[in-house]
Amino acid sequence: MKVLLLNGSPKANGNTAYALSQMAEVFAAEGVETEILQVGNQPIRGCIACGSCRKTGKCVFDDVVNQAAEAFREADGLVAASPVYYASANATLVAFLDRLFYSTGFDKRMKVGASVVVARRGGCSATFDELNKYFTISGMPVASSHYWNSVHGRAPGEAAQDLEGIATVRNLAKNMTFLMKAIALGKEKFGLPELDPVSPTHFIR
């Protein structure tokens, strides 16, 4: 069992990284393999809606997005973590997720998703909601904790002082592990749900 963790902060050793390290520690204790991918400090451009991925199965911009796609395919869960910028996720992470989710044609149903947000003070709820939308449009169950998954701190290292926030992300990792294992057992016994066909429509027709 494996989880891919995305660090959307430009700081490889900041508070977002610390929150992810706490989750990785729990996953290791639970026997879950982890891979932490540093996203926020990379030059990632946004989607240009060229449609190339519909023909080739990968993004036309051959960068870390395509490199992460295979890890995402093999993973049982995905954690997207970001600092809060103007009540939103880091734009680099947003560009990464837009392209990752749109360009990958493999079935993401029942992979477990979770988001973690880090802020000095406010904007956590809006950012948390923003990141979770990638999961809920993809048939991915969203793992939760005993509180919304936010950690507070400004200067690197301050997140360690947010004892409630750290407990929140550690419990998130425990709940996520349970959910991944439960889904694996369910798939083994019952298989995936057989979905109704979908006919895409516009609001004008």
Each language-model region and where it sits:
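Short, hinge-like loop/turn segments at secondary-structure boundaries
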Residues: G51-K55, N132, Q161-L163
